[in-house]
Regions:
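Membrane-embedded alpha-helical segments of transport systems
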Residues: 57-66, 85-102, 119-125, 155, ...
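Cytosolic, long alpha-helical scaffolding segments
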Residues: 79, 105, 218, 244-250, ...
């Protein structure tokens, strides 16, 4: 084997791994996090969990990616450990699809149909189409499709390069002796495991074995331990990922490890015992790419069928290794203050990570609303317990802003679609508004505290006016949060007219107070408090307007806030004017 053959082999391996990664990334981006959301929601049934694990892994072409995602689910409390077991078992089945794709290189025959099925025939076409779309396509989905096609073509080209590089070794006695050593089950497993740990992909390890099979020097007896070792080696990615995670997440990684170890040892013992008795004829025959795919699939499918009914064994083993603490609640959903749904493992799947950010932002919005409404209810009937809760909620919202902001900045550096980038920008804007609303809640609560400490109260007229104003504020807050949560654009159009009504209420209430002050019906001290509350109300409505405008802008692809606001509130905007008149009449001051 000369230097050029070595370079061809290593170069082919590099292209193979790059093509696999490119295709996998394209598939992940094309799915937009939908596959992960399906995994999260539809795994309550054990059989369904196995099937979904297999399906998702087959699509994204990586069992490691699936198991790491599952570790993230368990760490964040989204998925229980018992539900995770089935997904992990299914992931091992799904990863065998790659071997079947690579086995297409062995298709022979002169018919047009068979020729078209050969990767050497259609890979160049995929590469040409992929490059053309990548260079000319403007839509994100088109570019994702191009990445999938190019990744597949590069993967197949790398496979052919490796096969071509090792083909001359078919006549080498030294090469045959080396491969014969792998027939030793322990050595073969260790080599397969070690190589998989090195390249972090069991699919790639099995693919390289398929490339080596063209020499005819790889027997089935040598291939089996290598395949088994690759299955064990694939568990290291999840184990590494679980470092620093919760105890339950570590258990999920251990479930993957124990499942692969036990199924491998069980299969090896059964195979070698039966082979010693019956002397399987196929064991000494040269392995083929198709044969390797059959072994890989049969082994994993059989293991899933056999162990699924007794999958709780692996869960118990994980609990024996990492015992349950007295303070630990089994499969608990963490307190939202921990924001564990923002798991860094999800950053590898930006679409899903963004969905988790949206969920966290919705929680943040509701905490901010709770703080505001609780503070408003303190006006005229202050109590220390409720005031403490307002402070607690405001601090929680601040924590959310810090955590969410940092997470979104990390997420922004990942490969996001254009739509996801816009949604991320909207989230960054909105969480700032939610945080400011909670700050105004503190201000309102302090005004209520001052009234209580000084035994002050509003006049009956001022109280009636404030009741109307409060109704409008609660309405705009509820509406804007619902707009954010549901992305209801029709409802969003109602926010700006209501904000204009609130501006009018703010100005009118202050004007009326000055009149009462001149007539001696109100004190200057109460005037300051009323003005503070009214100003905070008006500023809350401004933040609600910002939230609704962000959602409307996202839909219209328009990010010039001031221009957009001017357009929708223009004097000739019929819909706006009608809605404004309706709300003005509804929130008429007495």
């Amino acid at each position: 084997m000369n230097i050029f053959m070595v370079l061809s082999l290593i170069g082919g391996l590099a292209l193979f791994l790059y093509g696999m990664q490119m295709m996998g990334d394209g598939l992940k981006k094309a799915s937009g996090g939908k596959l992960e959301m399906i995994l999260e929601k539809l795994t309550s049934n054990k059989l369904m969990a196995v099937l979904l694990g297999a399906g998702v892994t087959a699509i994204i072409q990586s069992s490691s990616a699936t198991t790491v995602m599952v570790v993230g689910f368990v760490n964040s409390g989204i998925m229980s450990l018992s539900r995770a077991v089935g997904v992990i078992m299914g992931a091992n089945v799904g990863t065998t699809v790659t071997a079947w794709i690579l086995s297409m290189t062995e298709i022979t025959g002169q018919s047009l149909f068979l020729q078209l099925l050969k990767p050497s025939s259609f890979s160049p076409i995929l590469a040409i189409v992929g490059v053309a779309i990548l260079m000319t396509g403007k839509k994100e989905k088109q570019r994702d499709g191009a990445a999938i096609m190019l990744g597949f073509a590069i993967l197949m080209f790398g496979m052919e390069m490796m096969s071509g590089a090792v083909e001359p070794l078919a006549e080498s006695e030294e090469f045959q002796k080396v491969l014969l050593m792998f027939a030793n089950p322990v050595l073969g497993m260790l080599v397969g495991c070690g190589f998989t740990i090195l390249i972090q992909s069991s699919s790639a390890a099995v693919g390289i074995l398929q490339a080596l099979s063209v020499t005819g020097a790889v027997t089935n007896l040598s291939a089996i331990p290598l395949i088994m070792g690759a299955n064990v080696g694939s568990t290291t990615t999840a184990l590494i990922s679980s470092i620093g995670a919760s105890r339950n997440a570590k258990r999920a990684a251990l479930v993957h490890f124990y499942f692969n170890i036990i199924k491998t040892v069980t299969f090896m013992l059964l195979f070698y015992c039966f082979n010693a008795i019956f002397h399987f004829a196929f064991a000494s025959e040269p392995a083929t790419a198709v044969g390797i795919a059959v072994i890989h699939s049969s082994f994993n499918i059989a293991a899933a069928i056999i162990f699924t009914p007794v999958s709780s064994i692996f869960e118990k083993m994980a609990y024996l290794t990492i015992p349950k603490l007295e303070s630990e609640e089994e499969d608990r959903i963490p307190a939202k203050s921990e924001i564990q749904i923002l798991d860094t493992r999800f950053l590898n799947t930006p679409g899903y990570a963004l969905e988790q950010c949206k969920n966290a932002a919705i929680d943040m919005a509701n905490y901010s609303k709770e703080a505001l409404f609780l503070a408003i209810d303190q006006i005229g009937k202050f109590d220390k317990k409720s005031a403490a809760r307002v402070i607690e909620l405001e601090e929680l919202v601040d924590h959310y802003e810090d955590e969410l902001g940092s997470y979104l900045v990390k997420l922004s550096s990942r490969h996001l679609t254009e739509k996801d980038s816009q949604e991320l920008s909207v989230l960054l804007h909105c969480i700032g508004d939610f945080e400011r609303i909670s700050d105004h809640a503190i201000n309102i609560m302090e005004s209520a505290r001052e009234m209580n400490d000084k035994s002050l109260s509003f006049s009956k007229k001022a109280e009636e006016e404030l009741t109307v104003f409060t109704g409008a504020i609660k309405d705009i807050v509820n509406t804007s949060i619902l707009v954010f949560q549901e992305e209801d654009l029709k409802l969003a159009l109602q926010v700006e007219p209501l904000e204009e009504v609130i501006d009018h209420l703010n100005a009118e209430i202050k004007k009326r107070h000055i009149k009462r002050l001149r007539k001696g019906k109100c004190t200057i001290e109460m005037g300051f408090i009323l003005s503070d509350i009214s100003t905070n109300y008006e500023r809350v409505s401004d933040h609600c307007s910002n939230i609704a405008l962000c959602l409307l802008q996202l839909n219209e692809d328009n990010f010039d806030t001031h221009m957009y606001q001017e357009n929708i509130s223009a004097s000739d905007n019929k819909d706006f004017n009608e809605e404004y008149k309706r709300l003005r009449a509804h929130y008429q001051l007495p």
